[in-house]
Amino acid sequence: MDRRTFAAGMVATGIAGRAGSPLAYAPEQLHLKPNGWMPNNSLPVLLYRKSIPVTPGLADVVERLFTQNGWPPQWRNGVFDFHHYHSTAHEVLGFAAGTAEIMLGGEQGTTVTVHAGDVAVLPAGTGHCRISASDDFLVVGAYPPNEHWDICRSAATPEVLERMRRVHFPASDPVSGKDGALPKLWTS
């Protein structure tokens, strides 16, 4: 077991605090431009690969991690199999079981393969759609405090774009907390 996996397990189980957490490594960044009717966002999608060790009860571990970092979990399920976005909330998807192909950015967007232990942070307006998934695929969805998600399946009107602009920047990264990558990467 490497140091990152060991320390990540310590953090995820609550044995270690956030200071010095190996989860603070740099996530992959996807910069998505408007695509057809999908508005997307100038803020990057953040993909944390293998950020949470895969252990029994991983969904509980993901929920505790997100809660600890100020992103209260709101559901466990999958990802819709239709293109959509949220205009009123940023969203974090913690992949708790299985594997899936997710298209980001709308039709003809970017397809990413996600596995249990990965995390994706989607800024408001980011198109996403499940292309395929294993039978055991499970996701924990969470949002910053006081953000209530909607589901948009059509082109953004001026009112929808204004709602997206008003969504606040989160105070912390759902994976690595206040000192994590998100507050540094999502600035304007």
What are these regions (language model features)?
Residues 131-188:
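Double-stranded beta-helix
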Residues 114-133, 143:
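Conserved metal-binding segment of the jelly-roll/cupin
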Residues 16-84, 178, 183-188:
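A short, N-terminal "cap"/entry segment at the start of jelly-roll beta-barrel domains
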Residues 90-94, 112, 119:
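His/acidic/aromatic-lined binding-pocket segments of jelly-roll/cupin-type domains
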Residues 4-20:
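N-terminal export signals
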